[in-house]
């Protein structure tokens, strides 16, 4: 079950729950936390040694009883939406799908085979849940 500290369209949480259930096969507790640019830059530096803000960071805990925290920065998502000629809604959906796939165990930084599969799945879910055309 996905919970959040910010009021967002209910569909986003439903989509994340569906992806997690499909990919993992069971319910997962996920805390979706919206934070500012300074805080996400601090976390990115602390955990990835990258001294810059990012759109999303995902942390997964446990093996059998999975729990995850997903930190999202709206300001970076807005910037990326402009940069990639997306609506904010589509960019947010992209980030949340991406994070859900990380929770499900996909990794694009250290495993190139897994990265290809992850980005294919990300595109499939983007088409399925296309917020700009639903």
From Swiss-Prot:
Keywords: Cytoplasm, Endonuclease, Hydrolase, Metal-binding, Nuclease, Ribosome biogenesis, rRNA processing, Zinc
Cell compartments where the protein resides: Cytoplasm
Residues that hold Zn(2+) according to the record: 98, 102, 108
TM spans (from-to): none
Main location: cytoplasm
Pfam families recorded: YbeY
Cofactor: Zn(2+)
Stored Gene3D superfamilies: Metalloproteases ('zincins'), catalytic domain
Gene Ontology CC terms: cytoplasm
GO terms under biological process: rRNA processing
Cofactor annotation comment: Binds 1 zinc ion.
Domain of life per record: Bacteria
InterPro entries on file: MetalPrtase_cat_dom_sf_prd, YbeY
Enzyme class label: hydrolase
EC number: 3.1.-.-
GO MF entries: metalloendopeptidase activity; RNA endonuclease activity; zinc ion binding
Function: Single strand-specific metallo-endoribonuclease involved in late-stage 70S ribosome quality control and in maturation of the 3' terminus of the 16S rRNA.
HAMAP family: Endoribonucl_YbeY
Protein family: Belongs to the endoribonuclease YbeY family.
Protein name as annotated: Endoribonuclease YbeY
């Amino acid at each position: 079950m996905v919970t959040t500290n910010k009021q967002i369209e209910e569909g986003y949480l439903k989509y994340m729950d569906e992806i997690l259930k499909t990919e993992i096969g069971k319910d997962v507790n996920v805390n979706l936390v919206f934070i500012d640019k300074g805080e996400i830059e601090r976390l990115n530096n602390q955990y990835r040694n990258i001294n810059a803000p990012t759109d999303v960071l995902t942390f997964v805990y446990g093996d059998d009883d999975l729990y995850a925290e997903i930190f999202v920065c709206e300001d970076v998502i807005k910037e990326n939406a402009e940069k990639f000629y997306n609506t904010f809604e589509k960019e947010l959906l992209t980030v949340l799908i991406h994070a859900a796939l990380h929770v499900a165990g996909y990794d694009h930084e250290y495993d190139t085979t897994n990265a290809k599969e992850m980005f294919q799945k990300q595109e499939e879910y983007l088409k399925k849940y296309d917020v700009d055309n639903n």
